From Swiss-Prot:
Keyword Hydrolase: no
One of the GO BP terms on file: translation
Stated name of the protein: Small ribosomal subunit protein uS7c
GO cellular component: chloroplast; small ribosomal subunit
Record has Lyase as a keyword: no
Organism (species): Marchantia polymorpha (Common liverwort)
InterPro entries reported for this sequence: Ribosomal_uS7 (IPR000235), Ribosomal_uS7_bac/org-type (IPR005717), Ribosomal_uS7_CS (IPR020606), Ribosomal_uS7_dom (IPR023798), Ribosomal_uS7_dom_sf (IPR036823)
Length: 155
């Protein structure tokens, strides 16, 4: 058995304007090549756009979008006796939230549009309204897990 101590999970720090951890998690996923100020600028423009379009608190829309995209289960490929099975697994809320953020950003990058701030804002608005590419991804994952429920005992 290892004598090394287990590293403690780091808690995400809140961002300077909204004082919210979720916003900071999103900024860290937008981040490319260490350009954090650009990532903040993209997100804050997206939040401003959300406020103009929906006339609601952008933080509320963001939370709602992440909550609706967060998956409960996921599938993991397990190789047993030479054949690969997609085994459904329940995931923790933190991991689900991280997946939701990743899916939202992936979906907004795929969107056609002017710039990342607009694409992100429209994807967040769509996700909060229960449609959009990220919501489809979640439903697809849940369907996959449901279809492979027979392999759940291979955990």
């Amino acid at each position: 058995m290892s004598r090394k101590s287990i590293a403690e999970k780091q808690v995400a720090k809140p961002d300077p304007i909204y004082r919210n951890r979720l916003v900071n998690m999103l900024v860290n996923r937008i981040l490319k090549n260490g350009k954090k100020s650009l990532a903040y600028r993209i997100l804050y423009k997206a939040m401003k756009n959300i406020k103009q379009k929906t006339k609601k608190n952008p933080l509320f829309v963001l939370r709602q979008a992440v909550r609706k995209v967060t998956p409960n289960v996921t599938v993991k490929a397990r190789r047993i006796d030479g054949s690969t099975y997609q085994v459904p697994l329940e995931i923790k809320s933190t991991q689900g939230k991280a997946l939701a953020i990743r899916w939202l950003l992936g979906a907004s990058r795929k969107r056609s549009g002017q710039n990342m701030a607009f694409k992100l804002s429209y994807e967040l608005i769509d996700a909060a309204r229960d449609n959009g590419i990220a919501i489809r991804k979640k439903e697809e994952t849940h369907k996959m897990a449901e279809a492979n429920r027979a392999f759940a005992h291979f955990r």
